[in-house]
């Protein structure tokens, strides 16, 4: 077992604090509308330029192992905040650094660390209650656009695009961010349910110019096994022909005689038909087929459920307004499923999302949820260089997460104002002793730092501005760092999602409280390099007379 290096009390805390401050100083420059960039060296490829707090924090690894302990713990704050709210990572880091700094000073002065932590936790609870009480529900698309704009560092086009995407696919819809191949940033919306399986044969194409099969008002047969013969299906096929409507078959596979028969029927004009493979694999395929059946108001034809192909009737087939199939994807538009059944399925998937521990499973379930709930929007981020595209994509990701958080828990005045106003909630908080009071005082100081840092980054004097803001009793009165003017932050469109502010403070206080109450740190002792063996003396024989 490797030897360990152990440090105690103030020596341990001070060295961790140095690491915390190094990380916080690198992250805090990115905060606010005039936040600066951080350039990160990559072991291969071009350097990365970003204004995203968590991306900066994740890159920091310090040489001193004790300093690195502190840096890694605060890095955890940024990561946790990113997972919980997707934005506000810089704010969380600044808050954590401030609480750790003031808390370490207090412990060095002889205050009880456990009482300090209780005071900090008490203060955080009071502030969270205040934030929730003053949170304003997001109702208009303009407000959604404003939240997106603020999180994208003042880029209005990004805010507007996210607002449009949410309008199109609903709050439950999936919005993904991809890198575009062009200079422009654009929004692509796919309405209805789309899955990544195309037609099984080009003979099913109805529009030769666009190379797609479009079927209006079709019947949909959803079958979980392979189809190699159509013999068992003849009764239902004949029933569909009688109606004069097209038929779409979604099955594990359609092959051999079955596929040939369908193609011949299509070419002769007897039956308008198209066949596609079922999406997904294994259990996920079955779940997606059930989703399709519920969305279209049909029944999944499965022998496990005791339904055989020969017994299928028209009533068991799904319906949709239109189905569009190209080489790689199938889109079902306006499925005729029962609204209550679809809502029930959505609730079921939401419950599964809440229970799953796998990020991959969660992502796939969220995709299924969106497809049932109404659509998928893709934001394609463009730019003239790869570095620019990556930097912009970071901002768009943040903006998207912030707007989702705003829809969930409402909005508060931005620019650090919501936390400043929460100082009132700390007045007259009951405490058991003076050390707990000191813990509350530490939080009071910390919640002023985000507003101060935003002003400092914009070239102003943070302490002066914060002093002026605290003199006012108006809840939304704040400082617009973009223009250098004071005013009502909500009217100016400078708003933050309440969830982002709340989780930033909670995550910061959680880790900072642990750092303050640390009494010993253990790291691996640096290995002593063994001295190199002496070089053999005496020179090499037989080298005399050589001319160099």
UniProtKB/Swiss-Prot annotation:
GO cellular component, one term: cytoplasm
Key word Isomerase present: yes
Binding, ATP: 30-33, 51, 87-91, 415, 496
GO annotation, biological process: protein refolding
Compartmental location: Cytoplasm
Catalytic activity: ATP + H2O + a folded polypeptide = ADP + phosphate + an unfolded polypeptide
Keyword Nuclease carried by entry: no
Keywords noted in UniProt: ATP-binding, Chaperone, Cytoplasm, Isomerase, Nucleotide-binding
Quaternary state and interactors: Forms a cylinder of 14 subunits composed of two heptameric rings stacked back-to-back. Interacts with the co-chaperonin GroES.
Family listed: Belongs to the chaperonin (HSP60) family.
HAMAP family: CH60 (MF_00600)
Protein role: Together with its co-chaperonin GroES, plays an essential role in assisting protein folding. The GroEL-GroES system forms a nano-cage that allows encapsulation of the non-native substrate proteins and provides a physical environment optimized to promote and accelerate protein folding.
Full protein name: Chaperonin GroEL
Biological source species: Beijerinckia indica subsp. indica (strain ATCC 9039 / DSM 1715 / NCIMB 8712)
């Amino acid at each position: 077992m490797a030897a360990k290096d152990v440090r105690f009390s103030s020596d341990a805390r001070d060295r961790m604090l140095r690491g915390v401050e190094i990380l916080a100083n690198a992250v805090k420059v990115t905060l606010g509308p005039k936040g600066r960039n951080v350039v990160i060296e990559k072991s291969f490829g071009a350097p990365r330029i970003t204004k995203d707090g968590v991306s900066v924090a994740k890159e920091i690894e310090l040489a001193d192992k004790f300093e690195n302990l502190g840096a890694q713990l605060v890095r955890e704050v940024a990561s946790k905040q990113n997972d919980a709210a997707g934005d506000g990572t810089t704010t969380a880091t600044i808050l954590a650094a401030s609480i750790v700094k003031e808390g370490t000073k207090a412990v060095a002065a002889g205050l009880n660390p456990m009482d300090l932590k209780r005071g900090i936790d008490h203060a955080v609870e009071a502030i969270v209650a205040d934030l929730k009480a003053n949170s304003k529900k997001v109702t208009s698309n303009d407000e959604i656009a404003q939240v997106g704009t603020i999180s994208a560092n003042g880029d209005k086009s990004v805010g507007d695009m996210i607002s449009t995407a949410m309008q199109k696919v609903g709050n439950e819809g999936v919005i993904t961010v991809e890198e575009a191949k062009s200079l422009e940033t654009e929004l692509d919306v796919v309405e209805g349910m789309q899955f990544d399986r195309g037609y099984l044969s080009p003979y099913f194409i109805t529009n030769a110019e666009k190379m797609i099969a479009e079927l209006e008002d079709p019947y949909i047969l959803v079958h979980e096994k392979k189809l190699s013969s159509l013999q068992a299906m003849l009764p239902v096929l004949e029933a569909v022909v009688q109606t004069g409507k097209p038929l779409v078959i979604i099955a594990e596979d359609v092959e051999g005689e079955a596929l040939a028969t369908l193609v011949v029927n299509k070419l002769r004009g007897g039956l308008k038909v198209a066949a596609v493979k079922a999406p997904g694999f294994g259990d996920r395929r079955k779940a997606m087929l059930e989703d399709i059946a519920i969305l279209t108001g049909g029944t999944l034809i499965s022998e496990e459920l005791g339904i055989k192909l020969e017994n299928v009737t028209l009533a068991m087939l799904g319906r949709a307004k239109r189905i569009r199939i190209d080489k790689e994807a199938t889109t079902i538009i306006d499925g005729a499923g029962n609204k209550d059944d679809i809502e029930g399925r959505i609730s079921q998937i939401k419950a599964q999302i809440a229970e799953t521990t796998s990020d991959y499973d969660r992502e796939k379930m969220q995709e299924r949820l969106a497809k049932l709930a109404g659509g998928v929007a893709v934001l394609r981020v463009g730019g003239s260089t790869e570095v620019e595209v990556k930097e912009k994509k970071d901002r768009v990701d943040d903006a998207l997460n912030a707007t989702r958080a705003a829809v969930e828990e409402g909005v508060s005045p931005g620019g650090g104002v919501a936390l400043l106003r929460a100082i009132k909630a700390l007045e007259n908080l009951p405490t058991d002793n003076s050390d707990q009071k000191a813990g509350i005082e530490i939080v009071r100081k910390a919640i002023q730092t985000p507003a101060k840092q935003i002003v400092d980054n914009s070239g102003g004097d943070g302490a002066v501005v914060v002093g002026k803001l605290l003199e006012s009793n108006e809840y939304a009165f704040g400082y617009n760092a973009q223009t250098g003017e004071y005013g009502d932050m909500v009217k100016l469109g400078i708003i933050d999602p309440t969830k982002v502010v709340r989780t930033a403070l909670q995550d910061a206080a959680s880790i900072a409280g642990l750092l303050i109450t640390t009494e010993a740190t253990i790291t691996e002792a640096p290995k002593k390099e063994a001295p190199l063996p002496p070089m053999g003396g005496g020179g090499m024989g037989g080298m005399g007379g050589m001319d160099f």
